[in-house]
Amino acid sequence: MATVKLSFLQHICKLTGLSRSGRKDELLRRIVDSPIYPTSRVLGIDLGIKNFSYCFASQNEDSKVIIHNWSVENLTEKNGLDIQWTEDFQPSSMADLSIQLFNTLHEKFNPHVILMERQRYRSGIATIPEWTLRVNMLESMLYALHYAEKRNSIEQKIQYPFLLSLSPKSTYSYWASVLNTKASFSKKKSRVQMVKELIDGQKILFENEEALYKWNNGSRVEFKKDDMADSALIASGWMRWQAQLKHYRNFCKQFLKQ
């Protein structure tokens, strides 16, 4: 184990979205044993009710991200996902919203992997904002639906999509490091600028012009561009992690034999 430095393994973990804490042997085993997921049909989600953002994308042979469908929707009114829901936050009504959303996303995109931005449970103030609780409720219901369906698929021996929870701080800080941005990634304008740089640098490509049109004309329609940026950063960052994990995992296997 002396032939590989701890700092090098920590750097690999940073490039692959893995935790950097632990001893050398722990990091090495983490890199080698972490699963590699398919990147052909990936759905990145920035969860919200009036600002539900999604980015459906894939990765080509050059590890570049190709966006197929990208938008942000207000689920309380007429929307592009055809969710029909009255703004009512009682558990029964939220369950109806969750089922509609769950079924629509699976039927519309048939994703192999779903990435959901992890919601916060603490706001740093004495009282938790009501909207935070509502979105947390939606998040929990979507997870419950997923694992119920996953259990059924296992019993029927059917392949079912993976659902992964991603820390927004991890994906945003990763892209801030890659793009060498000096602005704080916690600021919405900074994340919008990050996506703009990824598009201008052709690290993000588009299958069609519709998604790019929505992005370029965001100021003319009723959605916030920062929410749209977040789902793209989640999807593109995670797929880049996967490509690098595949590369470094094979490289690190040699050190396990020493």
Curated annotation (Swiss-Prot):
Principal subcellular localization: mitochondrion
Record-annotated SAP domain positions: 1-35
PROSITE patterns (UniProt xref): SAP (PS50800)
InterPro entries linked: Mrs1/Cce1 (IPR039197), RNaseH-like_sf (IPR012337), RNaseH_sf (IPR036397), SAP_dom (IPR003034), SAP_dom_sf (IPR036361), Ydc2_cat (IPR015242)
Binding site for Mg(2+): D46, D230
CDD domains, per database record: CCE1 (cd16963)
Known catalytic reactions: Endonucleolytic cleavage at a junction such as a reciprocal single-stranded crossover between two homologous DNA duplexes (Holliday junction)
EC numbers for this chain: 3.1.21.10
Gene Ontology annotations of biological process type: mitochondrial DNA metabolic process; mitochondrial genome maintenance
Keywords: Endonuclease, Hydrolase, Magnesium, Metal-binding, Mitochondrion, Nuclease, Transit peptide
SUPFAM superfamilies attached to this UniProt entry: Ribonuclease H-like (SSF53098), SAP domain (SSF68906)
Keyword Oxidoreductase found: no
Keyword rRNA-binding: no
GO molecular function: crossed form four-way junction DNA binding; crossover junction DNA endonuclease activity; DNA endonuclease activity; flap-structured DNA binding; four-way junction DNA binding; metal ion binding; Y-form DNA binding
Family annotation (SMART domains): SAP (SM00513)
Any matching Pfam family: Ydc2-catalyt
GO CC annotation terms, alphabetical: cytoplasm; mitochondrion
Compartment(s) where it occurs, according to its Swiss-Prot or TrEMBL record: Mitochondrion
Function: Capable of resolving Holliday junctions. Specific for 4-way junctions. Seems to be important for the maintenance of mitochondrial DNA. Cleaves fixed junctions at the point of strand exchange. Cleaves after 5'-CT-3' and 5'-TT-3' sequences.
Subunit structure: Homodimer.
Name recorded for this polypeptide: Cruciform cutting endonuclease 1, mitochondrial
Organism: Schizosaccharomyces pombe (strain 972 / ATCC 24843) (Fission yeast)
Name of the gene this protein is made from: cce1
